[in-house]
Each structure stands twice: as structure tokens, then as C-alpha cells.
Amino acid sequence: MKRILILCFFINFSFGQKYNADVIIYGATSSGVAAAIQSSRLGNEVILIEPTYRIGGLTTGGLGQTDIGNKQVIGGIALEFYQNIKKYYENPNNWIRQEKNEYKDGGQTRSSVTENAMWTFEPSVALAVLNQMIDDEKIKVYYNERLERKEGVKKIENKIKHIVMESGIIFSGDVFIDATYEGDLLASSGISYTVGRESKSKYGESLNGNQPNTLGKTLKNKISKNGAHHNFIFGVDPYIISGNPDSGLLPYISKGGPGIEGEGDKGIQAYCFRMTLTDHPENRIPFKKPDNYNELNYELLFRNYEAANGNLEDMYSYGDPLVPWINSLMPNRKTDTNNQKGFSTDFIGQNWDYPEASYEERERIVDHHRQYQQGLMWTLAYHPRIPKKVRDKVSVWGTCKDEYEREDGWQNQLYIREARRMVSDYVMNQKNCESIEVVNDPIGMAAYGMDSHNVRRYVNDLGFVENEGNVEAYVEKPFPISYRSIIPKKSECENLVVPVCLSASHIAFGSIRMEPVFMVLGQSSAIIANLAIEKEIAVQDLNYDKLKTVLIDKGQILE
């Protein structure tokens, strides 16, 4: 009995504790961290709440190859972060696994000699840099505190009064910022939102909704590489017994086809882990076959290679045709490894329930993704049905001993590319991305292409397997993001700002949803919060000219 009482004492120790600050930020993603830093520098008392044990989100969770579009639109605290990354790597003592001059970055993230910032990094370095920036501001961070989603938001007169965690801790403040990838605070606050893809007719777009096509067209009649990329080569059979529909579909193929082109649905673009791999023998953990490994889950991978009839180098015209990944090099002989081609790290169609799922169900979905990806990597590295050329190339890699807390070298942060999206008085859409419509109240800029990963896998009219949902459309120039898109409708809440799950259509979100842009929007959210507190007004009622002046003063790029 004494043992039970002691246990109960520790379990309930924090229940009912109350904390107050000017600004309460839920979600210590890179956006939430930027918001906290800016709030502190403006003189606001700020509390940063992180549902897990690690800050930084994807920036510290594997995404070291910064998706950016145009570096010139990144200013303020976001740029400061990348400048701090460069300072870290200027120290020769921080090059442990290779010499500095041996490292070659590439693509859009290549840093020129004259740049004062660096855009590629190890996740552990990003974590150290963000922690130092937080420590410098003496920001209070509460780890492992999850919002009680059913009744954890207390509103009075259309304002959030306080929020309650599952632990029972209560946080009250003047303005709240939801900086999570999932949008749990906005949803629990009764804010309008959507999940999935709108129909292309809803906002007058061309690339939204179902995309069962090889090529799409932008509103300006430019080509979008849709099904032409990240798909199977021709002739891959979808059935358990090839050629026999009665044997049933192979795992993770949707029944019923792709849907009608341009129609909306509840489909979510695929998630994956942005793996941090290494080929350094002393730091490498070889890929392990999962305990629950099921070879049938990878039958489509085998058949995709077999359909090449030995012509492996001709399978794909982009990337490395032998391997289904993008292996971007990070410092110290590490990588940021991402999805590419038809059967890769994206677990297509297996995340649709994630945005609205309970915490427990989300954990199961994350575990399922990890098991799938662990099995994929073991298969590519060691399975005899994989061509030897491929096995030889993959098996030299493995997860890192020195990056994440898990002993197997895998991270816990799943790449939540998209979940809930707020629906506010202004919805960013494809016309904004193509500069057909330009907002007059910018709080930051986006510049990446309109990008969506695949949403479903299905059987096409020819009886072969195909992926649907990929969109790759070029954005001609950076475009401004509206102040109205990160604040809810005033009738729904007057003291909440939402920099991550902002008000945007699926295809516009595909351009905006990059980590440096989320940092920019997080910083702008803090400035909005500060002005609303100073003036004692709703976040919707700011004088934009005043807001613009402060944004520019704090380093934000608005045009």
C-alpha cells in the first residue's frame, strides 16, 4: 500500500500547477523557437511548451538539407540561426569525421564563399544551436507536456484564458501561439480548419485535388511534373499473385482507383523519416531487419526492379537510378536522406488518420512508419531479390550512433509534411504562389515550388500499380504571405496566432511549408502578439503599417 501511495504522489505532483506569461507558445518546432526568442527580445515574458522531449521539430529531426527556394527572402531570427550554424562549422574542432575541405554541399543549399550563413547541418548541431539561442534569452521551456485536447482550452469572451495539459498543469497568458505541425491548439480552441485536399474549383486552382495524371499545368500554363516523377516504371503488377486479381491486392494499395481529377478528398501527402545516415565505420549502425518484418510489404519494390529487365541504369532519368532515395550530404560524413521514385521512404496512404488521431493512435502511426522504413532499408541493403549493385550501394550506409536518443539511431520526429490547415478570413492559394494575386499585408515570404508528395497508391486502367498526388510546379519568384493567413477569424478567437498550420490551400501550403519559412512566420507571430498586448487589442485589429515597421526593424524580408 505504501508503494502505491508513493507512486500516486509522484504521478500527481504537477497536477493543478499554474503558470502565467504574456505569450504562451505551444509547440517548440523551429517556428515555435523563433517565436519564443522574438517574444523574449521584445520584453514579453514567454513560456514555450513542447509535447516531446526535443525542441526544433524537423530542423533537429533530420531535415538538414534546407528546402528554401530563394535564400534572399530569409531574414531575422531564421537567418540568424543559419548564421550560427556557419559559425559552429567554422571551428575546425567540430569536424570530427572528416576535414572541412572534404565536405561538399550541393543543390539549392550550396553555400557560397561570401555567404555568412550555412544551410546544411547535422541534426544534433541544429539542436545545440537552438538550445543556445533559447538559453541566451533565458526562455522557460516545459518538455513532455501535451495539451488535453478535449477540454483543455478555456475561453472567455472569445479569448483563450488558459490551456490545460494532460499532466494537469495550467498555462495562462495574454496571447497564445500554436506552432505545432498538427494544429492541436487551434482545433481545441474551436477554430475553423480543414484536412486533406480541396477541389481545384474551390479557390480557382489547377493543381489541387486528385492528380491522377503524368503532367499538370499551372494557372500560367507552366508544366507541373506530377505522376511523371516518384512513380513506378511501366508494368508493375499490383496483385499478390501476379496477373491474378482474385489473389488480392498487395499491401498498401488503395481500392477503388484514384478518384476524379481535381476533386477534393481527405487524403494527406505521405510522411517519412528524414534519415540521418553515415558511411563512417566507427559511427555506423548497420540496418537491422525488424522483428515483425513481412517480405510481402516490399513485393512492389522487388517487382519494380524486376520490371527493368536488367537495365537498372535506365529505370529513371533523374537522381541515382539504382537507389530510391535522395542522399544529400551533411557535414561529418552524414546525410539527410529523403524519398525519391516510386517505392521509397514515403509510406504512401498510411497517414490519412494522423491529423485527427488521438495521441496514442498517432504514436502507433509513427511506429508503423518507422517499422516500414526500417524494413525498407534492410531490404535494399541485404535482401537477395534486390540487385547486387543496389545492395552494394545501400549496405555501406547505416544510422548514426551520435545523433538521436534511440539506441538504433532512428529519430522520433516523423516528417509531418501537412496535417490540419486553418481556414481564416484569407486563404493563401495557388494564385498567390504564381503572383496572380499579391497580398498587401505581408509578414514573410515563400519561394519554394508548389510541392506535394504522393497521397495514394492504386491500380490504373491498364491494371498496373501507380502513385497519385505528386505535384512539382515551379514558382517563378518569391511571394508574400498574408498577415490574415496566420490569425483566425475574429469571431472564433481574438488572441491566437497560427504560424505553421496557417490558412492555406493544400497546394499553396505545399510551397509555404518549409522550415525557414516557418521560422519567419514564428517570428512574425511573436511581433503580432507583442503589439496586441501593448495595445490591448485583438490580434486581428493591428494597424498593418505599424506591424510592417516592426517586422522590417526586426529583419524580416517582405518584398
Predicted features, each with a name:
Residues 1-4, 100:
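Positively charged n-region of N-terminal signal peptides that target proteins for export
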Residues 3-13:
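Sec-dependent N-terminal signal peptides
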Residues 18-29:
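Beta1/beta-strand and adjacent pyrophosphate-binding region of the FAD-binding site
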Residues 32:
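N-terminal Rossmann-fold NAD(P) dinucleotide-binding loop
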Residues 39:
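Aromatic pocket-lining residues of Rossmann-like dinucleotide-binding sites
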Residues 44-45, 50-154, 194, 202-204:
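Conserved N-terminal/central alpha/beta ligand/cofactor-binding core
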Residues 127, 169-175, 179-558:
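Flavin (FAD/FMN)-binding glycine-rich loop and adjacent Rossmann-like elements that form
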Residues 151-170:
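Conserved beta-strand-loop-beta-strand element in the redox core of flavoprotein oxidoreductases
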